[in-house]
Amino acid sequence: MPGNSPIYYWDTCLFLAWLKDEERPTGEMDGVRDIIERSKKRDARIMTSVLTTTEALSARIPAGMDTLFQQMMRRVSRVGIDIKVASLAHDIRNYYAKGGGKTLSTPDAIHLATAIIFRVDEFHTFDGNGSRKSLGLLPLSGNVAGNRLAICKPETKRPQLDLRRPNPPSE
């Protein structure tokens, strides 16, 4: 039933992984493809920020994939950045900046704030390790600056056998 379908917030990296058909550890891309198929059947809803469009189209994606991306985005709920989102994103960045170590990038803070405000069921990302300067998102699951948010990789209900590569990369 569409009204009871789970709402999954997608970080930009998932759209990029799908557009580039990235080679990822076994099962990860199956999760991406499964959620896309479920959204086509209205068994799940994908939400993201309008920021994703800018991030995805400024990335290096294969020729012609921008059209495919635009078609896919018709089925995705895109949320604008308003004062509530901006304020919470600011608070989230400040919370992690207080530690003096790694912080969150502004786009990551906007994505997290949007997901929190819209009370999604899960925030999906592959961002586990972050970078030298930025925190990864997966380790924040459960408590994002004092806000409850489940953060995970998308999981499939029907794993596929990938015969394209004999040795899948490890994390």
Where are these regions (language model features)?
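Acidic, PIN/NYN-like endoribonuclease modules and their adjacent C-terminal/linker elements
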Residues: M1-I7, D30, D34, I117-E171
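Short, well-structured N-terminal submotif of metal-dependent ribonuclease cores
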Residues: M1-T48, S58-Q70, Q160-E171
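Active-site neighborhoods of divalent-metal-dependent phosphate/nucleic-acid chemistry enzymes
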Residues: P2-G3, R78-L135
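Short catalytic/ligand-binding loop motif for oxyanion handling, primarily in non-cytosolic enzymes
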Residues: A17-W18, E55-L57, S131-L135
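General small-molecule cofactor/ligand-binding pocket signal
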Residues: M47, V79-G80, A150-C152
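Active-site-proximal loop/turn and secondary-structure-junction residues that shape catalytic pockets
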Residues: T52
